[in-house]
Each structure stands twice: as structure tokens, then as C-alpha cells.
């Protein structure tokens, strides 16, 4: 089964996601399309529009962190692992401006005692602007 067809079966767990759902499923979604690469890492793209700003002409920091969190989540979803963000440490290195085209990347560093460690970054013109490290855990069965 390919990563993309495999993804569709797990994506239903959050089909109205504010970051990655289609505009049809959630009109307020950022509608980011993440792709799984052969090495298991994830890449996506995002165009910064005026509605995404916090400070004048700059991408809102909360949206930046959501893009990173979404990419890390997809690293796990593509592996058929549904996990929740337990910790997200974000570093803002340089601002992202309106009309920037952002490349989003993420990969899984590993898993220890049921905790997945992931890393993600936002780049503009191959320059790192924002980085994050995250820890994810599987939800307990109800």
C-alpha cells in the first residue's frame, strides 16, 4: 500500500483539522497538504496570506507552531500511528512575512517507552525561520 493511500485511512481521525483538512471539510482550515517522502520524512507548503498575520505583515506565531505540529503529526499518521502532542518546543529564528512561500519539513527521531520524538522546521527560500521539537504519545483507550 502506498503512503498516500495508506494516509487516507488514518486521516479520517481528524478530517476537520484546522491545519490539514480540505476547505470542504473545514472552511477555516489552512488546507496544508503534507507528503510523505521515501525516507519517512514529511514535506508540505504554505503561502502566507493577510488573514494569517499576527503583528503587521508577519505570520502569526501560533499558526507557525500549528504548521510544525501538523507536519510532525503526519510523520506518525503516515506510519499508521495516531498520537497526541504531549510537548512542543518552538524556536523562532527569523520572521516569516506576508506572501512568503513556506516549506514545512518534519521527521521522526525515534520512539522510547511509547513517546515519539519528532523534529520540524519552517523554511523560506531554504532559510530556516522556525524550528520545533515535539513529543507525541498514543491516547489511552477509552
Predicted regions and their residues:
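Non-catalytic linker/capping segments at the edges of enzyme domains
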Residues: 1-51
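Active-site helix/loop of acyl-thioester processing domains in fatty-acid/polyketide metabolism
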Residues: 41, 58-83
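Short beta-strand micro-motifs enriched in acidic
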Residues: 35-37, 107-111
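HotDog/MaoC-like acyl-thioester-processing domains
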Residues: 1-15, 96-98, 109-142
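Residue-level recognition of well-ordered beta-strand positions that form the cores
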Residues: 45-47, 89-91, 105-107, 121, ...
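Short histidine-centered catalytic/ligand-binding loop motif
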Residues: 48-62
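Hydrophobic beta-strand-centered segment that forms part of the acyl-chain substrate-binding groove
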Residues: 71-103
Amino acid at each position: 500500500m502506498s503512503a498516500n493511500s495508506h494516509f487516507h485511512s488514518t486521516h479520517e481521525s481528524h478530517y476537520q483539522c484546522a491545519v490539514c483538512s480540505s476547505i470542504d471539510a473545514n472552511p477555516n482550515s489552512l488546507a496544508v497538504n503534507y507528503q510523505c517522502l521515501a525516507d519517512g520524512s514529511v514535506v508540505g507548503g504554505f503561502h502566507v496570506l493577510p488573514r494569517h498575520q499576527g503583528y503587521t505583515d508577519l505570520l502569526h506565531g501560533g499558526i507557525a507552531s500549528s504548521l510544525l505540529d501538523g507536519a510532525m503529526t503526519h510523520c506518525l499518521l503516515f506510519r499508521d500511528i495516531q498520537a497526541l502532542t504531549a510537548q512542543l518546543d518552538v524556536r523562532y529564528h527569523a520572521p516569516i512575512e506576508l506572501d512568503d512561500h513556506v516549506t514545512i519539513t518534519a521527521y521522526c527521531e525515534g520512539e522510547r517507552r511509547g513517546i515519539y520524538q519528532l523534529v520540524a522546521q519552517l523554511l523560506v527560500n531554504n532559510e530556516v525561520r522556525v524550528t520545533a521539537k515535539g513529543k507525541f504519545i498514543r491516547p489511552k483507550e477509552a
